[in-house]
UniProtKB/Swiss-Prot annotation:
Belongs to the glycosyltransferase 2 family. One of its GO terms (molecular function) is phosphotransferase activity, for other substituted phosphate groups. Keywords: Antibiotic resistance, Cell inner membrane, Cell membrane, Glycosyltransferase, Lipid A biosynthesis, Lipid biosynthesis, Lipid metabolism, Lipopolysaccharide biosynthesis, Membrane, Transferase, Transmembrane, Transmembrane helix. Pathway: Glycolipid biosynthesis; 4-amino-4-deoxy-alpha-L-arabinose undecaprenyl phosphate biosynthesis; 4-amino-4-deoxy-alpha-L-arabinose undecaprenyl phosphate from UDP-4-deoxy-4-formamido-beta-L-arabinose and undecaprenyl phosphate: step 1/2; Bacterial outer membrane biogenesis; lipopolysaccharide biosynthesis. GO terms for biological process: 4-amino-4-deoxy-alpha-L-arabinopyranosyl undecaprenyl phosphate biosynthetic process; lipid A biosynthetic process; lipopolysaccharide biosynthetic process; response to antibiotic. Residues 1-235, 291-327 are cytoplasmic. Catalyzes the transfer of 4-deoxy-4-formamido-L-arabinose from UDP to undecaprenyl phosphate. The modified arabinose is attached to lipid A and is required for resistance to polymyxin and cationic antimicrobial peptides. Plays an important role in pathogenesis by providing resistance to antimicrobial peptides within macrophages or at other anatomic sites encountered during infection. The keyword Signal does not apply. It comes from the Bacteria. The lineage of its organism: Bacteria, Pseudomonadati, Pseudomonadota, Gammaproteobacteria, Enterobacterales. The gene is arnC. The chain crosses the membrane at residues 236-256, 270-290. Residues 257-269 are periplasmic. Its EC number is 2.4.2.53. This is Undecaprenyl-phosphate 4-deoxy-4-formamido-L-arabinose transferase. It comes from Salmonella typhimurium (strain LT2 / SGSC1412 / ATCC 700720).
Length: 327
């Protein structure tokens, strides 16, 4: 039995994208929650290429007296999970907590995650209670959660909630992974020895709109399927086998009917033959597209380009410095 190391410092990683309205309240509430921990702490804000004044507000917060805020500025938008990975590469805590900037997951839940992690868990996930999202978002989330559970075999209730806690060894291991498409909650669970979930409150979004549109949710679902499991390829092989057997059986049936009923019947069955042909062609194109997606991801991973470009990091009471990039 392995004993978990004591938690001496907590790092809170928050990706920010056009959240200027919620940032002041986010910083205030997160700071208050961290001060109640009785441990050392830091807050890392990662600007994911915001077009509003989010970056300026972050820099100002880092430069205040007695600030515990580190601001990381990416040169453009790379996506939520890439921004979080950028934050992971700068943390110094023993326990790292991720939190969205929209305040739908209350920062006041942070002490509960820390207390649960203190029980020896490597990963502490959360399940949103009484979700305040639209029916579309709730339905899409249920489909994605079910899809993840079926394809990865990792049974957790709410993969879409980013309010989560990870011990430092899990973070260090994830940073050594170089996949271009990364879904952090699943990747962490792959390496976790002990994982659990706790229920948390969920509030309505007070400022701005959700950054996940319908198309982004569709792309997220497709990314999850193709970057985390080879199950679709296995299903494709199974589907191909079924179609091949069905096609062979249908061919035998058509030959028998042709011999039994004569050429008159064969002429009248032309449209059915076309329908069967188009079905097979459609299945082939679907298979080719899926294989192409996997090959494209392999190509991107082989090139090993950095996930993001860190333009600037602002530490409390320090001078900003520039980094070239980070994988």
């Amino acid at each position: 039995m392995f004993d978990a190391a004591p938690i001496k410092k907590v790092s809170v990683v928050i990706p920010v994208y056009n959240e200027q309205e919620s940032l002041p309240e986010l910083i205030r509430r997160t700071t208050t929650a961290c001060e109640s921990l009785g441990k050392a702490w830091e807050i890392l804000l990662i600007d994911d290429g915001s077009s509003d004044s989010s970056a300026e507000l972050m820099v100002k917060a880092s430069q205040e007296a007695d600030s515990h805020i580190i601001s990381i500025l990416l040169n453009r938008n790379y996506g939520q999970h890439a921004a979080i990975m950028a934050g992971f590469s700068h943390v110094s805590g023993d326990l790292i907590i991720t939190l969205d900037a929209d305040l739908q997951n209350p920062p006041e839940e942070i002490p509960r995650l820390v207390a649960k992690a203190d029980e020896g868990f490597d990963v502490v996930g959360t399940v949103r209670q009484n979700r305040q999202d639209s029916l579309f978002r709730k339905s899409a989330s249920k489909i994605i959660n079910l899809l993840i559970q079926r394809t990865t075999g990792k049974a957790m209730g709410d993969y879409g909630c980013m309010l989560r806690a990870y011990r430092r060894p899990i973070i260090d291991t994830m940073l050594r992974c170089h996949e271009r498409s990364t879904f952090i909650p699943i990747l962490a669970n792959i390496f976790a020895r002990r994982a659990t979930e706790i229920p948390v409150h969920h509030a309505e979004r007070e400022f701005g709109d959700s950054k996940y549109s319908f198309m982004r949710l569709i792309n997220l679902m497709y990314d999850l399927v193709t970057c985390l499991t080879t199950t679709p390829l296995r299903l494709l092989s199974l589907l191909g086998s079924v179609i091949a057997i069905g096609g062979f059986s249908l061919s035998v049936l058509l030959i028998v009917l042709r011999l039994a009923l004569g050429p008159q019947w064969a002429a009248e069955g032309v449209f059915m033959l076309f329908a069967v042909l188009f079905t097979f062609i459609g299945a082939q194109f679907i298979g080719m597209g899926l294989l192409g997606e996997y090959i494209g991801r392999i190509y991107n991973d082989v090139r090993a380009r950095p996930r993001y470009f860190v333009q600037q990091v602002i530490y409390p009471e320090s001078t900003p410095f520039t980094e070239e990039s980070h994988q």
